[in-house]
């Protein structure tokens, strides 16, 4: 992530609430001691849910130091780690499962998205799980106008700019298919979630096996 991107999340860390629902049933086959990584964990919301459900070996990493500080203050027992970039200082196959919630939306660049997915594949053991939740292209007039303006500015349809300087991306199913190529799909569902501004949007959730 660029320095500008990291600065955006640091500046907004105190105010943001993340809402993508965590379907614990999709993780039910994992032992409670399974090694779980929440990549792009923010302030640790999903880690707290995992801990409350009995998982004891989950860690979260994020580029935003302010997000990590917020999470540590609210949940001092959570394993929250600030990272500077890729690759992570972890061996191949270090994790039984990786959670990737609303992270691809924060990465407008194709090459950066592919680099992240390659790194997550490296970190997941053979047979391990990848649980992705991210925004699909929306069909309302407001977002369609954003996509048109974003395509003119960034050269990619689905990339758009927030008024506060944030740059985000929504995806086609085909784009998510390509990013998850080589993983075996186990389950998927469309879910309704809300944006930072409170707008209701549709996200696609998938759990797949490496």
Locations of regions flagged by a protein language model:
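Class I (Rossmann-like) S-adenosyl-L-methionine-dependent methyltransferase catalytic domain
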Residues: 1-34, 39-87, 131-210
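Non-membrane alpha-helical structural segments and their capping/turn regions in soluble enzymes
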Residues: 65, 110-117
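A short acidic, Gly/Pro-enriched loop at the edge of an enzyme's catalytic core
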Residues: 86-98
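A short SAM/SAH-binding and catalytic strip from SAM-dependent methyltransferases
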Residues: 97-111
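Flexible, active-site-proximal loop/turn residues at the rims of small-molecule/cofactor binding pockets
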Residues: 104, 116, 136
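A short glycine-rich, Lys/Arg-flanked "PGG" loop and its adjoining helix->strand segment in the class I
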Residues: 114-126
């Amino acid at each position: 992530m660029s320095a500008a991107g990291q600065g955006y999340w640091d500046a907004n860390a105190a105010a943001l609430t993340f809402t993508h629902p965590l379907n614990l049933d999709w993780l039910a086959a994992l032992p409670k001691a399974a090694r779980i990584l929440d990549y792009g964990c923010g302030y640790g919301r999903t880690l707290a849910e995992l801990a409350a459900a009995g998982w004891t070996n989950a860690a979260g990493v994020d580029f935003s130091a302010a997000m990590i500080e917020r999470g540590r203050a609210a949940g001092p027992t959570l394993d929250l780690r600030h990272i500077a970039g890729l690759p992570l200082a972890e061996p191949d196959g270090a994790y039984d499962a990786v959670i990737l919630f609303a992270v691809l939306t924060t990465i407008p660049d194709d090459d950066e998205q592919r680099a992240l997915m390659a790194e997550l594949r490296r970190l997941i053991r053979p047979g391990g799980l990848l649980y992705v939740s991210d925004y699909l292209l929306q069909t309302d007039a407001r977002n369609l106008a954003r996509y048109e303006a974003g395509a003119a500015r960034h050269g990619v349809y689905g990339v758009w700019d927030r008024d506060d300087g944030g740059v985000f991306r929504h995806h086609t199913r085909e784009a998510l298919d390509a990013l998850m190529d080589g993983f075996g799909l186990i389950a998927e569902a469309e879910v309704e979630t809300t944006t930072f501004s409170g707008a209701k949007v549709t996200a696609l959730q998938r759990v797949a096996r490496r």
